[in-house]
Amino acid sequence: MNDSHTSPSYESLRRRILTAGVIILVLGFLVLVFDSRAFFEAYLVAFLFWSGISLGGMIILMIFHLTGGKWGGVLRPYLHASLGTVLLIPLLFLPIPFGLSQLYAWATVSAEAAAHSPHKAIYLTPTFFLIRAMVYIGFWLVLALLLSRRGEAGDHPKISAVGLVIYMLTVSFSSVDWIMSLERHWYSTIYGVVLVSAQGIGAFSLALLLTYRLRIRGEDSTEEIGPKEKADLGNLLLMLVIFWAYITFSQFLIIYYGNLPEEATWYVARTSGVWGWVALALVFFHFILPFILLLSRARKQNPFGMTRVASLLIAMYFLDILWLVVPSFDAQSGWVSILALWVTIGMGGIWTFVLTHRVRIQRPMESLS
């Protein structure tokens, strides 16, 4: 059996992806010269997208360690490889501190304005923001390193049990800091869970896409996926889609019935103009269509059909992040959205290079286990 992960053509492709990603990202950085605000807004979207995929892969892996099942064995090479991309998060975060004043209104708020909300004024300061970011990222790095170790068989479930709690807490708090505080007067008590559900869909869809796509092309030499495993993978993706829809709708319903101006304005900005159409697209393409498609037993058994569903959900994950972040900014949402897509593609080249490097290492390790 031929494993293309170590072939010269595979290495050449990896280098081309990295080169293209770096060039695209550097060209994106040139926007700093004439529109630094738009660049940092776009960069935040790209950072949240790729860091979310990395963290989502980690939570899926921890769930597998706790529950077991052959479905996890199918995705394990890519989930383990995604742990290596967690190491990219501190590097990708580096530009954000330089754009705090352009991203977050609270970073430049006056003392008089801060007096109206003293608790938020204490919490939302640039120094404390960066300290918390270092704590979150530090926890993620330690967790990724522990899960990457090949220790005793019983180690990973224990690490995963504690890791899930750490993950939920750190992602919830980081979602408040990095996204919710873009509009510092707005808040939602389940916002962190919304982001967790989105990250899970993005990471699971990407792992599924890579697994099936390589098998379709005959570039994966591991054992064939059985009908039961295919059904399990489809059902798990369906469950994640339903969970995302449930949490997202619950947040909307709570705010709708609360009918408080400081909460309702967040949805007004995201259901007006072009963002209203984006919201409808998310309802249809992120929930209704995948829900209908994943109800089909035949589709779950069809790798080609599942790659299409996974690709759709990855695109919707990006659109979801865009919808959560960009309406918080004052203007130029069209320009920022286009720039965000450009920077996301560039950052993706670097992310993919690291992932494929980890997959190449992981394959021999899997064969020995």
What are these regions (language model features)?
Residues 30-39, 177-185, 322-330:
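Juxtamembrane "helix-exit" motif on the non-cytosolic side of transmembrane helices
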Residues 145-152, 215, 353-368:
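Membrane-interface capping segments at transmembrane-helix boundaries
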Residues 47-154:
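Transmembrane-helix bundle segments that line or gate the permeation/cavity pathway
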Residues 53-63, 90-96, 133-144, 197-212, ...:
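Hydrophobic cores of alpha-helical transmembrane segments in multi-pass inner/ER membrane proteins
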Residues 189-195, 262-283, 327-358:
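Membrane-interface transmembrane-helix boundary segments in multi-pass integral membrane proteins
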Residues 2-54, 121, 355-361, 369:
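N-terminal regions that are enriched for targeting/export leaders
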